[in-house]
Amino acid sequence: MRKSLSLFSIFILIFLGLVIPFITLTAFRPLNEEQYTLKQESSTGKGINETDFINTMFLRSSFFENWSETNYFINPTLKTSKNLLFNDKWYLDFLQDSYSTGVVYDKPNEVFLNYYQQWHSLKNRYMVEKFYDVKKENFLNDLIDFIYAFAVKYKMFNVSKEIVKNVDRYKENHYPRVKLNQDNWKLIDDIENVDKYKWEDETYIGITKIWKNKEWNWIIEDWKLHPPFSNVYLSSYKAIYRWTGVGKPQLPTIDKNTGEITDWNSYQQTRVKEFIDLSLYSVLLENTRVQQGGSADYENPNKVGTKRIIFDFETVDELDVKNIKKAIYRMILTVDEANLIISGSLELNNINNDDLSFNFSFMRTGMGEVFNFNGSIYSSLNSKDLKYYQQFSGQFDLSKFLQSFFASALVPVFQNRSSFIENGYIDNLQYDTVLVNFFALKLQNFNNILLSENINDKLQFDKLLNSMFKISQKFYTNYLRTIFDLENNTYVQGYNKKYGLLVNNGFKIYPRYFYFSDKYKQLDIKLYSAFKNRFYTINNYGSVFNYDFSVANNYNISLNSGYVFGGDLQNKYGLQYKKIEEQKIGYNVFELQAQKENDMYRYYDFNFGIYNWQEINNGGLFPDKQWWQVQYITPKGWWDFGAHIKNAVIWIVNTIPGVKQVNELASGVGKVFETVYSFFSQIFEVWKFNPALYSTITNIFLLIIFMKFVRLI
């Protein structure tokens, strides 16, 4: 009886071992094939296409199940009725929201534009022309330079302080850059020694008396038009001035009865001060827009819709206390009304030192993807004289350029990378460097995007590019603060914002760190998402708050929430956050409500990991078109029960929306598989069981474990 029961048990086990794989194979595999067949969208004339994007970066995002206007892409692993469109609009919006440090719309504010358009009458009304000739071809800079020079001369300290604070070129050097008219007219003290032979080369004026209309009148004579006959007549001049400025001078006016210059008097000073008080805010606002990449072409102000997407990295060497070294690395993409890139630039500026810098600009040649570019390598000392060492030009393909840029540019290099990959989180984040290569800093990669037939001397061009790459490499060797660092200042839509992001570079897909800092009225708001892990302790940025992300339409912040501040601040601001320990919906949106001010902050973030796609593809880790999935295992045959059951678990992870802690689930399942197989391998190694029986029993155990996981979902 026992023998027959034992045989019956073995028969049941074998039967289940044969049937279950067919069930899992039939139930899961066809669904998977239907789910992950993506339609290739044509992108002719639209810029980067789907293949380019997939090759550009590896990312995975939670899906906004409740679609919002700020959601620009979806997770292909989740069921949705939305079409997958990989076009320029989608791609640029993603870059703008995920990486950019600012967006500037290329349109000046109406008040400042009115100053430009009405300048002919304004300069007379406010008597600006008595002090300085503001040139319209360089209107913004010339106007700021005049206001600063006037403020310094007439001790308008609040005005000069605001300009130093907001205008980059005055932060390092506080000296006025232009002379006022009265400073350009130098009084000649020793009249007898005036060099009359330079009258044709320089401008002299003399104040003298003439008999006119039966009375003596004081007049100004321009010696180029009315030179004195000899030195004998010089004694008849009350005063002689020499023009020391640039350009054609404007003769001052005098009182015909006294001979005194009436320009620059107290009344005229008052009128100019009125203009400065009226215009300073608009002028500085416009300057900020231009500093962030906006156009100063006021002759063509109707470029409605054009904008500049800015990727700005500012570094400061704080170790050099006496002479703080500062460098700015900036990329700007200019986009037209059709959301197509029409031009762009990359620039490394080293300020207050003589390190080499470079500028690389490009512009669309027509409707295609061919762009002309120009580059130069230069140095400057104290932001004054520029010295160019090398210059080059050529053409490249924009799509390939963006692909190379964003595929290889953002590659964090962690010191404890292996530990991070194993555990899926960073308890103490420590890394040697974060490599941000705007050109991928590999000459071979950059040469791949060039249209080489347009390069006359390829060898010389390679040499020039290598020089630029070395400069850029030195920049990132010396400095650590990049987009991945905290406290990155940027100016967006009228207020200062700080933004930092730490991304993972391991097998785990979901990053667990996000940092955001903003100024709300007088309150400094800081949001963190770190799952109670210590956050960037190297520089001691403080404790970590655990805020939640949510995508539900019925999101109620009063549920499972806490107050950011207690006591009086709680009553004043009413700022709440949702507790992450009790609510783990998704990783897309977090909200912060300022209830007392009847205002709400809602920031959207895309949860993604960044990989170097070239390394992944070369290693064969993620085949093309399956970059978003946990990869399926290819069974050796219908009898490969382990592969079928593993594929069933992978299907759950890849397909079902709302899987809680999907990364931990995937990690946990993998560890269980590893543990179970290890356990039975040791047993069967000792007892030498039949391999077929070993496989069957193992897979039944795995199926039981799998069902346990399913019940937890």
UniProtKB/Swiss-Prot annotation:
Subcellular localization: Host membrane
Top-level lineage group: Viruses
Keyword annotations of the record: Host membrane, Membrane, Transmembrane, Transmembrane helix
Xref: InterPro entries: Phage_1-C74_Orf1
Residue ranges the record marks as coiled coil: none
Main localization, broad class: host cell
Recorded topology in the membrane: Single-pass membrane protein
Pfam families, per the entry: DUF3688
Segments passing through the bilayer: 686-706
Assigned GO CC terms: host cell membrane; membrane
Homology family: Belongs to the plectrovirus ORF1 family.
Record-given protein name: Uncharacterized protein ORF1
Organism per entry: Spiroplasma virus SpV1-C74
